[in-house]
């Protein structure tokens, strides 16, 4: 057991600390972590599926040419 002491039923440790919702900033809940609700979770999913989230890529032609030669 953690802490080396006795553990009673009234001293339950949460699985993780509450963090702000990744979408709106309200406290997250366990069922929808890291979001506060199903709505915020679905808004984020929609952004991923619609392509709103993208990793920017800088085109460097000199590196692209070097990659072709082996």
Curated annotation (Swiss-Prot):
This is DNA gyrase inhibitor YacG. Belongs to the DNA gyrase inhibitor YacG family. Binds 1 zinc ion. InterPro entries: DNA_gyrase_inhibitor_YacG, Znf_NHR/GATA. Interacts with GyrB. GO terms for biological process: regulation of DNA-templated transcription. Disulfide bonds: none annotated. It comes from the Bacteria. Keywords: Metal-binding, Zinc. Inhibits all the catalytic activities of DNA gyrase by preventing its interaction with DNA. Acts by binding directly to the C-terminal domain of GyrB, which probably disrupts DNA binding by the gyrase. One of its GO terms (molecular function) is DNA topoisomerase type II (double strand cut, ATP-hydrolyzing) inhibitor activity. The gene is yacG. Its cofactor is Zn(2+). Zn(2+) binds at residues 21, 24, 36, 40. NCBIfam families: PRK01343.1. Pfam families: YacG (PF03884).
């Amino acid at each position: 057991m953690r802490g080396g002491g006795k553990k009673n039923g009234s001293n339950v440790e949460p699985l993780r600390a509450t963090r702000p919702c990744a979408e709106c900033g309200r406290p997250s809940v366990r069922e929808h972590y890291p979001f506060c609700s199903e709505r915020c979770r679905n808004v984020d999913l929609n952004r991923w599926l619609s392509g709103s989230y993208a990793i920017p890529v800088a085109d460097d032609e000199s590196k692209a040419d070097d990659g072709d030669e082996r």
